[in-house]
Amino acid sequence: MNPFNPDAYCGIYCGACSIAMHGETGRADGFAACLGSVPTEELICGGCKSDTVYAGCSTCSLRHCAREKGVAHCVDCADYPCKMYSRWQSVAKFLPHSREAVSGLAAIKRDGADLWLAVQKKRWSCPDCGTPFSWYAPECHKCGHKLVSETYKIYGWRKLLCRFVLPAAYRKGKAKSSTA
């Protein structure tokens, strides 16, 4: 697997991705737990800008578009915000971490990707011990520091949605990769 790249085309910080964290630590947070039907050995990802992408993300239309156009981020495209990005946002809003994409792109455009990545790395690291944590981790797996105010929760209808939509995205990605 190539080195992990936490940068994403859409403005999400892949460094706090539950699937990437699971691949690194073997621990499943609330988000990764929604993927119960996905084989554990497939919960790995090098980030959406890598060649080793989790099957559920491999079919992302934004990723394919940005790669085709040769842009580092959607905000670098002359068509941004386009219909594709707006459609993705209307669906992505159901997953709390995805809501940060637009503000992430604004920060990338304003401050540059390197500064944005540094800020995100600090934000998604435990304030007590510096260990990285995922969007949905309730506490630091190393020191036990409570992270509830700094992370997202999946509960109620979102948890139900998560249990169906995420495995469906995985199956779609696997089906597409097996026919390629």
What is the role of each PLM region?
Residues 1-111, 122:
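Hydrophobic scaffolds flanking metal-cofactor catalytic centers in soluble metalloenzymes
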Residues 1-4, 176-180:
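Basic/polar N-terminal segments that are highly enriched at the extreme N-terminus
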Residues 36, 115, 119, 177-179:
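Contiguous alpha-helical segments
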Residues 45, 74, 126-129, 140-143:
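Short cysteine-rich clusters marking metal-coordination/redox-active sites
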Residues 65, 82, 144-154:
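Short Cys/His-rich micro-motifs in 6-15 aa windows
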Residues 66, 126-133:
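Short Cys/His-rich zinc-binding micro-motifs
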Residues 85-87, 152-162, 166-177:
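Short metal-binding segments enriched for Cys and/or His
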Residues 104-114, 127, 154, 163:
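Short, C-terminally biased terminal segments at protein or domain edges
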